Amino acid sequence: MTEPNERPHGPAPETNAAVLDAKGLRALAHPVRLQLVGLLRKHGPSTATRLAERLGVNSGTASYHLRQLGAAGFVEEDAERGNARERWWRAVHQSTWFDDPELAEREPEATMAYLQSVAATYTLRVQRALNELQTMPRAWRDTFDMSDWPLRLTPEEASALHEELRAVVTRYRPDTPEGAATAPDGAERVSVITHFLPEPDATSVPADSSGPGSGSGTEAS
């Protein structure tokens, strides 16, 4: 699996980030495309054949999705590496940002497809870590964590908590070429994934409210 460096929501894009518009949103609304972008961002330029092997798909499928990503501006051909027999691709950006409520309103189906693709990608990343956990050095096994804390918050409090957590994470060294160059011995990639999952109770929503969150659901905690 891959690390797509997706930020479905965020207050401000970082340097060299793709800020999604309608075209980009639709282009990334597919798990394979998210994985392809993630592989190119993590490992650098590659070919459709090599990427297909990593993802367990055929090279034709990988080539098709790479062309779609290229048309949307997420990847581009690496002319310095390519030749007449093989096309090499590289990522254009290091991360993706999506924080446009108006766009989400205009493109509800594409928005949901994109978010579902991100969620599926995160699930596979967790599963990969679990599969590799027993073979990790003990020091790294001891850092592994999956936790959840059910809270009762207002929307304003939830937003404030999100900002506080983001501020904590950004104090640490990012997984970028610059970060790798200054990292001490023993530093490895660590993925920190956050989920804020509103679960409004049906009885707590005003009678005239509608839309996501106004119905009942199944308790998970």
Regions found by a protein language model. Name each.
Residues R50-E53:
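A short acidic, leucine-rich amphipathic alpha-helix
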Residues M1-L28:
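N-terminal leader segment of winged-helix/HTH proteins
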Residues R26-V32, T47, E76-E102:
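Short, cationic-aromatic polyanion-contact patches
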Residues T135-S221:
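Charged, low-complexity intrinsically disordered regulatory/assembly segments
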Residues R90-P150:
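Amphipathic alpha-helical dimerization/coiled-coil segments
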